[in-house]
UniProtKB/Swiss-Prot annotation:
GO terms for molecular function: ATP binding; ATP hydrolysis activity; double-stranded DNA helicase activity; RNA binding; RNA helicase activity; single-stranded DNA binding; zinc ion binding. The lineage of its organism: Eukaryota, Fungi, Dikarya, Ascomycota, Pezizomycotina. This is Regulator of nonsense transcripts 1 homolog. RNA-dependent helicase required for nonsense-mediated decay (NMD) of aberrant mRNAs containing premature stop codons and modulates the expression level of normal mRNAs. Also capable of unwinding double-stranded DNA and translocating on single-stranded DNA. Keywords: ATP-binding, Cytoplasm, Helicase, Hydrolase, Metal-binding, Nonsense-mediated mRNA decay, Nucleotide-binding, Zinc, Zinc-finger. Residues 163-193 are annotated as: C4. It comes from the Eukaryota. Zn(2+) 2 binds at C117, C120, H139, H145. Residues 103-135 are annotated as: C3H. It is found in: Cytoplasm.
């Protein structure tokens, strides 16, 4: 197989076979003759493969470089970039001078196996070594490069891979389509060209579009894998060495492998966080460097976010400030993360007027309605010079500020040097010391219900009693248990009983606003302190904001007069401005001192306006989403009574720097106290979900302790006509076997089959009368989020406005929120790459607990069931008869049988011991003991940042029709010249069809074969199967990819099924992929039609 030469001729953007017949003849038996060592599945289940050690680690990061994120310690992303202390370079036996086109990693230089990166001009090969990504794909992802060129001596010549229609060169969105009547392969981008309606009239079958990158490597017929002998002779770099080399190239592009030895002894890993600390200086010495690491990383990331050549639209905001609207391509590619309130600098460098620059704040980020960023410029003396008449030649820079990190460092310093910053008891508890609480006499309120809030249940009242009588309390609020109401009630009683102010904080502005609104209902005097940069951002509690209360305060006539003068004229004289600021500060102090409750973010608690104030009572909501130093900011303002509210079984803090996260900066103070056996008070009655939806999360994550405060009847929308498998149980897992693909950014994933079926489900809800605002679509991957948004807009049969109003976002964006109906798209569908983000139990817990009336999960159960947690979930759905497959109009119970997962899952119990109040369930295994808790990384992802450049601009490019005219040179080619080409019927006769007709799939409805399309072919993961005809996987891949090792992809399994007359046999010592032969055989038979021959 390795010696077989594959010859192609490159004609424009068509790839034409010169030796197809020889390929077909030589590759007929390759599937059964591959050595087990070459099988990618071999290492997954043990032996000498990369996963043979049996250990797993989840190492996601907020930059969403999920393509390099595996579940094993040998993967490229699971190893730190640094940590080179013990690295050794394994040089080849005979080191000699390598040609310029040698792989920059390993030195392999076979022309057919190397590819040139057009961004950095380095060459890389298709070898994988000990990782799961080929060297070229690994480099493209890590370096954020996307354009490549083949070697001049390769069979295709020095081809630059690009779309035949629009010319885009992003390899992550490029794929190929075989022509129906010509012996050519056409390269098209996934969107818009590969999905353009104008393509349907062409001689190309767009349902057969396949990506050029599969299994994290270029297709074998495009870039040949090196032989075993070449790999043995090559330089062997470990994944940490490759990661370090990529980092070196960012600073020194000409660095070589030899330069790695110079840094091999450097080990600058920070000291990990501890459970206990000797004193506050010890505490500061541990956390201080971690905060600095995160700060430096954030600064480097933000300062690299410069964007040139922008087109800007101008308009005046309601406050008469200039607003600039523009699209940032780097946001769409996932390289830039923006949030409302971030500061940006706009510059004009055109020729129509003198250079200009202005600074403003982000007031809008891309969402379903618009891909634009909106920046509101700050008022300045030269407002008239804003170039509103210009629209081109602008640039944008991110203005990085160290405010958040400086306040964390200052809080830790204050904790160390100021004895009055916290009480003695809190001081010792924060350091992890054993200390007895001093007995205090308090008079409990006669009734705990407060005006303006709902009645409390028994567990809420118990929590409030315990909080009021203890100086430090943790409240664990599982999903839907009313922790916001409980927190607001606690704040009311603390304010009334202690007759002192309460400081209320949370890590996000959204969480602060929600709690602030509830507290206001109780009648307490509340002030919402916001950052200066967010004063113009609309919120539900704007009327409570400090700056707004100052503006509305008319008791100070002088200040009122200056406010009106400034509003009318836009500016004040220097003397008036000085007096205005003085009077404003006085008014702010008065309002703050007279307030019962002050609400702000944790970082906002470090605002200088609060520096002179002392807060005896501090409550931090969503504290499990705050890094510990962030929580310290509000605590060092004199607290004597602290309440931390959160849920350590849901998502944790977002830490950008992997080394800092690995050292423990991603652990919240709440979690550390739990590990110190400080038992949280758990709220036990959930009011959100239908009881069938709360059963699994309760048993798996909360030891069966959750009780239902709502009945099944109260959470059943009988007015909604939806094909639930069990009408009284509004949940289902819809089996979809579509393959995952890499998104345009190269750092995320998408699944076209799942996206198409999400649209079908949303449309069905619309037709049943569900409002768009009541539907939420959750997906862990930004690539899928962007693709779903565009799929609904482009193919949805309902009103376009309705689809735009459906929120499509990441799990993180939905934490703390709820929708009537939730659709969860799992995306991951592969044989040996793992399931990435999905393996995080805390992320799954959040995703499963957002829906009130119904939950639909779309995923590939065959892949997901290999993970222990998902295995339990799938078995649960199957026991409830809610695991289904087939078209949405005719769902059938899945026949899938589950084997044992790779590792038995045990829910984390940490150090808390809660007695389960619900009935025991033998399906959910007993928790581990405290000493054997397994830790899971919970890296997070920022949502609402468009990723697929192509999908964002599909509206702009979609009108470009594909040329129907082939070059004249193709007139000599006929289908008979290539017997394996899918367009040729049996015996090479064009247009001939097999007997029988294709039936609808029961393996999840395909993209093409649905009630909303008129296409005659079905799709499994984008591989089209005509009525009785051969599939792309069974035809073209056999002809042009016979050298491909067995991967058990959809096409390979389909091919094996066809060739074995309907039997999915076990190949030469490989583990059989399908545990349930009947299910898969039935699925394939329905896709192909019974008359296939």
């Amino acid at each position: 197989m390795a010696n077989m030469e594959v010859s192609f001729t490159h004609l424009g953007n068509h790839l034409v076979s010169d030796s197809a017949a020889a390929i077909k003849a030589g590759g007929s038996d390759e599937l059964s003759n591959i050595d087990p060592d070459e099988n990618l599945l071999y290492g997954v289940y043990g032996g000498r493969g990369p996963r043979g050690n049996g250990r797993r680690r989840h190492d996601d990061d907020d930059n969403e470089t999920e393509v390099l994120d595996d579940d094993d310690d040998e993967s490229l992303a699971s190893v730190p970039v640094d940590g080179m202390k013990s690295l050794k370079l394994d040089a080849p036996v005979e080191e000699k001078e390598l040609p310029p086109h040698a792989c920059a990693y390993c030195g392999i230089h076979s022309p057919s196996s190397v590819v040139k990166c057009l961004t950095c001009n380095k060459w890389f090969c298709s070898a994988k070594g000990s990782a799961f990504s080929s060297h070229i794909v690994n480099h493209l992802v890590r370096a954020r490069h996307k354009e490549v060129q083949l070697h001049p001596e390769s069979s295709l010549g020095d081809t630059v891979l690009e779309c035949y229609n629009c010319g885009t060169k992003n390899v992550f969105i490029l794929g190929f389509i075989p022509a129906k009547s010509d012996t050519v392969v056409v390269l098209l981008c996934r969107q818009p060209c590969g999905a353009s309606t104008s393509t349907k009239d062409m001689s190309w079958d767009i349902s057969r579009w396949q990506p050029l990158i599969e299994d994290r490597a270029f297709l074998n017929w495009l870039v040949t894998p090196p032989t075993d002998a070449e790999q043995l002779r090559a330089r062997h770099l470990t994944p940490p060495m490759i990661a370090k080399l990529e980092e070196m190239w960012k600073e020194a592009p000409n660095a070589t492998v030899a330069d790695l030895e110079k840094t091999a002894g450097v080990d600058d890993d920070p000291h990990p966080v501890l459970l206990k600390y000797d004193d506050p200086y010890h505490y500061q010495n541990i956390f201080g460097p971690l905060v600095k690491m995160e700060s430096d990383y954030d600064k480097k990331l933000k300062e690299a976010q410069s964007e040139d050549g922008l087109q800007v639209r101008w308009h005046l905001g309601l406050n008469s400030k200039h607003v600039a609207s523009f699209i940032l391509p780097k946001i769409e590619s996932g390289d830039v993360k923006l949030a409302v309130g971030d500061e940006m600098r706009l510059k004009y460098k055109g020729e129509l007027r003198p250079p200009w620059e202005g600074v403003g704040y982000v007031i809008k980020i891309p969402n379903n309605q618009s891909d634009e960023v909106e920046v509101e410029l700050r008022k300045s003396a030269n407002d008239k010079s804003v170039p509103t008449e210009c629209t081109h030649n602008f640039s944008a820079d991110y203005v990085w500020k160290a405010t958040s990190y400086d306040r964390m460092q200052l809080a830790m310093k204050t904790f160390a040097v100021d004895e009055m910053s916290v009480s003695g008891y809190i001081f010792h508890k924060l350091l992890g010391h054993e200390v007895q609480v001093a007995p205090t006499k308090i008079t409990m309120p006669k009734k705990f219900h407060v005006p303006g809030l709902p009645e409390l249940n028994a567990s809420q009242i118990a929590a409030i009693k315990q909080v009021l009588s203890n100086p430090l309390s943790l409240i664990q609020g599982p999903p839907g248990t009313g922790k916001t109401v409980t927190s607001a009630t606690i704040i009311y009683h603390l304010a009334k009983m202690s007759n002192s102010q309460v400081l209320v904080c949370a890590p996000s502005n959204v969480a602060v606003d929600q709690l602030c609104e509830r507290i206001h209902r109780t009648g307490l005097k509340v002030v919402r302190l916001t950052a200066k940069s967010r004063e113009d951002v609309e919120s539900s509690v704007s009327f409570l904001a400090l700056h707004e209360q100052v503006r509305m305060n008319t008791t100070n006539k002088e200040l009122d007069g200056l406010v009106k003068l400034k509003t009318e004229t836009g500016e004040l004289s220097s003397q008036d401005e000085k007096r205005f600021k003085q009077l404003t500060r006085q008014a702010e102090r008065e309002i703050l001192q007279n307030a019962d409750v002050v609400c702000c973010t944790c970082v906002g608690a470090g605002d200088p306006r609060l520096s002179k104030m002392k807060f005896r009572n501090v409550l931090i909501d969503e504290s499990t989403q705050s890094a510990e130093p962030e929580c310290m900011i509000p605590l060092v303002l004199g607290c004597k009574q602290v309440v931390l509210v959160g849920d350590h079984k849901q998502l944790g803090p977002v830490i950008m720097n992997k080394k800092a996260a690995k050292a423990g900066l991603n652990q919240s103070l709440f979690e550390r106290l739990v590990k110190l056996q400080f038992t949280p008070i758990r709220l036990k009655v959930q009011y959100r979900m239908h009881p069938c939806l709360s059963e699994f999360p309760s048993n798996m994550f909360y030891e069966g302790s959750l009780q239902n405060g709502v009945t099944a009847a109260e959470r059943l929308r009988k007015d909604v006509d939806f094909p639930w498998p069990v009408p009284e149980t509004p949940m289902m897992f819809w089996s979809n076997l579509g393959n995952e693909e890499i998104s345009a950014s190269g750092t995320s994933y998408l699944n076209r089959t799942e996206a198409a079926n999400v649209e079908k489900i949303v449309t069905r809800f619309f037709k049943a009368g569900v409002k768009p605002a009541d539907i939420g679509v959750i997906t862990p991957y930004e690539g899928q989020r962007s693709y779903i948004v565009n799929t609904m807009q482009n193919t949805g049969t309902f009103k376009k406005e309705s689809y735009r109003e459906v929120e499509v976002a990441s799990v993180d964006a939905f934490q703390g929120r709820e929708k009537d109906f939730i659709v969860l798209s799992c995306v991951r569908s592969n044989e040996n790459q793992g399931i990435g983000f999905l393996s995080d139990p805390r992320r799954l817990n959040v995703a499963l607990t957002r829906a009130k009336y119904g939950l639909v999960i779309i995923g590939n159960p065959k892949v997901l069931c290999k993970h222990e947690l998902w295995h339990h979930l799938l078995v649960h759905f199957k026991d409830k008869k809610c695991l289904v497959e087939g078209p949405l109009t005719n769902l059938q119970p899945s026949l899938l049988q589950f084997g044992r997962p790779r590792q038995a899952y045990r829910p984390q119990r940490s150090h808390t011991q809660h007695v389960a109040s619900g009935p025991s369930n033998g399906r959910f295994a007993a928790p581990l003991t405290a000493g054997s808790v397994r830790d899971y990384e919970t890296g997070s992802m920022v949502s609402y940042i468009p990723d697929d450049v192509s999908s964002i601009h599909s509206s702009a490019l979609g009108g470009a029709a594909l040329s129907s005219g082939y070059p004249a040179m193709f007139s000599n080619f006929h289908p008979e010249a290539w017997a394996g080409l899918p367009c040729a019927g049996p015996n090479g006769r064009p247009g001939a069809k097999g007997r029988g007709r294709a039936t609808e799939s029961i393996a999840g409805e395909s993209v093409a074969n649905s009630e909303f399309t008129d296409a005659t072919s079905s799709v499994i993961g984008g591989k089209g199967i005509g009525q009785g005809g051969a599939s792309l996987g069974a035809g073209l891949s056999e002809a042009i990819g016979s050298a491909r090792p067995t991967s058990y992809s959809q096409s390979d399994r389909l091919k094996q099924y066809v060739e074995s007359n309907g039997r999915m046999g076990v190949g030469n010592g490989y583990r059989r992929y399908d545990d349930d032969e009947k299910s898969v055989s039935t699925a394939f038979a329905s896709q192909i039609g019974t008359g296939f021959d």
